[in-house]
Amino acid sequence: MDQLTNHFHAHVAELNRRVAEIVARENLSGLVIHSGQPHRQFLDDMDYPFKVNPHFKAWLPILDNPHCWLLVNGRDKPQLIFYRPVDFWHKVADLPDEFWTAHVDIKLLTKADKVADLLPKDIVDWAYVGEHLDVAEVLGFKTRNPDAVMSYLHYHRATKTEYELACMRKSNEIAVKGHVAAKNAFYNGGSEFEIQQQYLMATNQGENEVPYGNIIALNRNASILHYTKLENQSPQPRRSFLIDAGANFFGYASDITRTYAFEKNIFSELIEAMDRAQLEIIDTMRPGVKYVDLHLATHQKVAQMLIDFDLATGDREGLIEQGITSVFFPHGLGHMLGLQVHDMGGFLHDERGTHIAAPDAHPFLRCTRTLAANQVLTIEPGLYIIDSLLQGLKQDNRQHQVNWNSVDLLRPFGGIRIEDNVIVHSDKNENMTRDLGLD
């Protein structure tokens, strides 16, 4: 923790530098960052699980306390308005007493609707950053989530501080423990629900604490890209297991995927081929490389796998140009990672907000940035048997390039995805996931 504490000082200094630059450019007095507030379920007296504003947790690891506010201008010590009501119904947040408290001045707020008493008296030149624009309007903010400020913050968020990198190494460490437990549960005959429980226990995080809904998919369910239903019965026969699951540390996410075969067979060989291809793509990551080019190179490798495993005929370029590889690998290679699983700024060319869209042929790619040092990205190639997409191939001449017998053979296994979390350094890549021993 001592090292994290030391890194935090430099982290806050960098965030202050960024804020000072953008508020001066936009003639603002500063930013007022709202942690957020609960959302009430329709016709109910209960709230949905609270999710903190990522711009708020960039400054402070306060993840579960709504109605907090942070005032920053890049010059003065940040001011934290910390919500601590008198409430006998719910657990009230403890008074902050952690390493980060030395870097903020703290004022306590006991009633959420009295925050105006603690905000700057002349709020006109301060910009509100948060979700609740109606609250901001009532409080008198004229500037709310201004595009220039948001683009600047999102663009620079891609460059992680040493504190952020340390947090993400820790979130990977926690997630790897869960993945090992889930793998063992799979081979011991667990159902999707049981595997999920083993994962959560190993990470010591609940379903509302992990950064996204875990994907725990057995057999054909692995062909559903965002499968989040958990079946209580263990399938028979047991063929395959795809797990896409992460963990959270101080608000920073990990996002890891593995695929396993229950027995040695053609599917296990395909997993090994995908694993080699994924590591080869990671080896080519370096500053100056365009993420789009990594994605296109992955399609070359997927095309070769389709040929090698007798799933399709033809040459690699033809399979790519005709969109056949996109049927088997329909999603993007990965995305930026950080405060959010799909971290902001993946399409920004510069701090002014210039947008670079994904190529027309690959609309689901979530990142078009050029790699730079201290960026963190996922690399997650996949190959799936998705009937709704394969049906499109049967409607034209491309059907003759697909070996449907091979497709039928692999259909019960669902699909494959392998995902690691990688830090780009100036002179190397750091595969946080593999460095922790997760094969």
Curated annotation (Swiss-Prot):
One GO CC term, this protein: cytosol
Enzyme class (EC, first level): hydrolase
Cofactor binding note from Swiss-Prot or TrEMBL: Binds 2 manganese ions per subunit.
Binding site for Mn(2+) 1: 255, 335, 380, 419
Keyword Iron-sulfur annotated: no
Reactions performed catalytically: Xaa-L-Pro dipeptide + H2O = an L-alpha-amino acid + L-proline
Co-factor requirement: Mn(2+)
UniProt: Mn(2+) 2 binding residues: 244, 255, 419
Annotated transmembrane regions: none
Any one Pfam family match given in the protein's UniProt record, by short name: Peptidase_M24
Family: Belongs to the peptidase M24B family. Bacterial-type prolidase subfamily.
Entries under PANTHER family matching the protein: XAA-PRO AMINOPEPTIDASE 3, XAA-PRO DIPEPTIDASE
Described purpose of this protein according to its UniProt entry: Splits dipeptides with a prolyl residue in the C-terminal position.
Protein name as it appears in the record: Xaa-Pro dipeptidase
Organism whose genome encodes this protein: Shewanella sediminis (strain HAW-EB3)
Gene this protein is translated from: pepQ
